[in-house]
Amino acid sequence: IYSSLRIEANALSLNEVRDVINGHVVLGSQKEIQEVKNAYAAYEKLDQIDPYSMKDLKWIHGIMTSFLVQESGEFRRGEEGVFDGDECIFMAPPARMIPHLMKELFDWMKENKDTIHPLILSAVFHYEFVFIHPFSDGNGRMARLWHTAILSKWKPVFSYLPVESQIEKFQEGYYKAIADCHIAGESNLFIEFMLEQFDRILDEVTVQLRSSDENISEYVKRLLDVMEYDVPYTAKSIMDLLQLKSRETFRKNYMNPAIEMNLVVMTVPDKPQSRNQRYIKK
């Protein structure tokens, strides 16, 4: 909830979001506080949603935008676009086309849900939904919630995976993938982007499970915390991130145990002391 709202520029902190959800008094924009209440109420309905029902989509949008917009729970009746200052960089389809386009999208999902993999189908829906921009407000929040709804109907574990948090982390890439798809006229780049995010999420979950199962040392945990996925690091750059000066301490306590547990791999495994050696977090 916090991450999905942050993507939409809600300024409340994580602690403030928690306080709102727990019914505590929070000093802040009433609109932003209402957004938190609405998003929490919408996500509470996740297990009741039929992701292939347009009626349910409008129902959840009504919850997500309650007390915030006049057209809550209804498709927009006005025209919408994305602007960079005074320049329109994307114009959504005309309002008169929304019912037809949304029916086509939901019909396509129903027809293909048993033949197209849910990870791909949900990403296609996410992009097409953002492109159609069916509501006057809340389209981004609804797209991300519905993405989760489709996947959690397939595998309930997806209702617990931090999809929105991952998108927030790679927010620039998220919007770039959408913009590139607008130009290309297809959703392939967005599908690839989302699959990469799920791959990262599952890697992180795997590490967390290993951490609890194998009692990873605090040294290795610190090492993994400072390393990003798929980024090749030199030993010196990692030592700088860890604020270490002793190469022996670094090897003995941090890097060697991580390599032994297959949490970090070497780019030149047959020559551990190579000057070209780099380390990549798995």
Label each residue range with its predicted role.
Residues 1-282:
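FIC/Doc superfamily catalytic core
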